[in-house]
């Protein structure tokens, strides 16, 4: 299960709206355990300049910097997020091929009218599997 505070969901949605019609992407920082809890997000650069409408590739330096930030805050990178402009919040074949095991992937459907659903996924041996995503109050999402 992945817990995402509502205020951080709004940050992700804002990023998706600002980047529309391109895919935006970023890192999810938080606490790992039986329940993964996202406590911070970090925007990343989409390196797929020619195909940002339907592809994303996170700049490796953003991952290095995000990992450093996470460790400084006693957190880990629990996953990544990206938007799907004018498409459902489900992994594409491209997404599934490039997903790393262990990490959670939050996908945000977005359109010219605004944001749609947000879903979470993990790569398992059998392919991408939807992960339970629970939206929590900002207070509950704080790192204690």
Short names for language-model regions:
Residues 1-77, 85-144:
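Conserved beta-strand-loop surface patch within small alpha/beta domains used
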């Amino acid at each position: 299960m992945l817990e995402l505070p509502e205020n951080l969901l709004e940050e992700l949605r804002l990023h998706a709206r600002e980047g529309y019609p391109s895919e935006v992407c970023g890192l999810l920082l938080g606490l790992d355990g039986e329940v993964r809890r996202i406590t911070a997000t970090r925007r990343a650069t989409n390196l797929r300049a020619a195909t940002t409408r339907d592809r994303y590739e996170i700049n490796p330096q953003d991952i290095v910097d995000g990992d450093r930030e996470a460790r400084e805050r006693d957190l880990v990178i629990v996953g990544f997020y990206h938007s799907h402009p004018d498409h459902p919040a489900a992994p594409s074949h491209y997404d599934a091929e490039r997903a790393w095991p262990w990490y959670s992937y939050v996908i945000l459907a977005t359109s010219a009218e605004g944001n749609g659903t947000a879903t979470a996924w993990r790569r398992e041996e059998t392919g991408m599997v939807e992960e339970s995503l629970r939206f929590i109050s900002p207070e509950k999402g704080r790192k204690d």
